[in-house]
Regions:
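Acidic/histidine-rich helix-loop elements
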Residues: 74-99, 126-134, 224
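Conserved catalytic region of serine esterases and O-acyltransferases that act on ester linkages
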Residues: 36, 52, 192-193, 215-316
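Substrate-gating cap/lid alpha-helix
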Residues: 137, 167-201
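Bacterial N-terminal signal peptides that target proteins for export
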Residues: 3-15
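Serine-esterase "nucleophile elbow" of acetyl-processing enzymes
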Residues: 28-79, 83-86, 94, 104-112, ...
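Structural recognition of the beta-strand scaffold that forms the well-ordered cores
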Residues: 39-43, 71-76, 114-120, 156-161, ...
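A short helix->loop->beta-strand "cap" motif at the edges of active sites that frequently abuts
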Residues: 150-156
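Bacterial N-terminal signal peptides
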Residues: 14-26
Length: 316
């Protein structure tokens, strides 16, 4: 669900988006995908699975480029890592963290993405101090992921550095410093190997620090890990800026500026919620306690129905 932001410091934090380090070009108001990009896959953990930043991103494109069609597939899986690591007693001992290695090939075969956004790291350090072996496992996993996507013929790959970790006591220190190290390594791969990287971690950490300076109670994630709507809006705006979009600071208000727009945003969010569980069910995974989605064929039919509803609204 897309919910307007209310925190007074949010407009200030958005200023950092304009100056944050991007491994990409300048801001241009044009369709951000080439004609060869038809299906975009999002890989990640529970933050990606929640899907709000993806729905926001899609809704912006739907409202601003009604003549273009593109499909966003959310294949995020809660608890997942790319490192293959899992802490002892994870989830109260009910199950270990799922490993992307186990399912990636099935996802790629089923989705056949032209482009992939991948965001890993927050779970890969398994909430422990920086350690050479864990850090090496993350780097190895990211190398494997990138090369797997290249071998699968993915035309464009964009890595997103980890979300900020907001420690209850140390705020942007502690485990967030571990994520900073992971992020710095990932950003370095842009210069070293030409990877596309969006440094969400640096931008969000800076924005959080600005928010805290204005209001010590300001948080993106009440549980330290999972951002609420403000954090998802921040992420959406950052990604849109990376995709050369001129995005206003009040993007949420712009998207919801009319009754028609509100309906479009709601339809996009509903479609995303339905499809993510259908895709996870169709491609399979080893993470228990997940919602059971519709059979993929049925979900795709409903996807088309919702697309038709959106088109009708756009033509009014």
């Amino acid at each position: 669900m897309v919910v307007p932001m209310t925190h007074a410091t949010l407009k200030k934090t958005f200023l950092f988006v304009a100056v944050v380090f991007f491994c990409g070009g300048s801001l241009l108001a044009q369709w951000p995908f080439g004609a060869h990009i038809k299906r975009v896959l999002f890989l990640g953990n529970s933050i990606t699975y929640s899907g709000e930043y993806i729905s926001n991103l899609e809704a912006w494109l739907v409202e601003n480029y009604p003549a273009h069609q593109i499909e966003f597939v959310n294949a995020g899986l809660p608890s997942e890592t790319v490192s293959g690591l899992s802490e002892e007693g994870h989830a109260g001992g009910r199950f270990p963290r799922p490993d992307l290695h186990e399912r990636l090939q099935r996802v790629l075969k089923a989705v056949k993405p032209d482009m992939v956004f991948a965001c890993y790291g927050i779970n890969d350090g398994i909430y422990q101090p920086l350690a050479p072996d864990r850090f090496a496992a993350f780097r190895s996993g990211m190398d494997w992921l990138h090369q797997s996507l290249v071998k699968a013929g993915v035309k464009r790959i964009v890595h997103i550095t980890p979300f900020v970790y907001d420690d209850e006591k140390t705020r942007t220190k502690g485990y967030n410093d571990v994520m900073a190290a992971y992020s710095q390594w990932l950003v370095a791969q842009h210069k070293k190997r030409g990877w596309e990287v969006v440094d969400l971690h640096a931008a969000m950490t800076k924005a959080l620090e600005t928010g805290i300076a204005a209001d010590s109670n300001f948080r993106y994630a009440k549980d330290q890990v999972h951002p609420g709507s403000e954090g998802h809006w921040f992420t959406s705006r950052l990604l849109l800026a990376y995709l050369h979009q001129k995005v206003p600071a009040d993007i949420h208000q712009t998207l919801l500026s009319t009754e028609k727009n509100e309906k479009i945003v709601a339809l996009v969010a509903r479609r995303q919620t339905m499809m993510k569980d259908a895709w996870l069910g169709a491609t399979g995974h080893k993470r228990p306690e997940m919602p059971v989605g519709l059979p993929l064929a049925e979900a795709l039919d409903k996807y088309k129905q919702i697309a038709a509803e959106i088109k009708c609204l756009q033509e009014k």
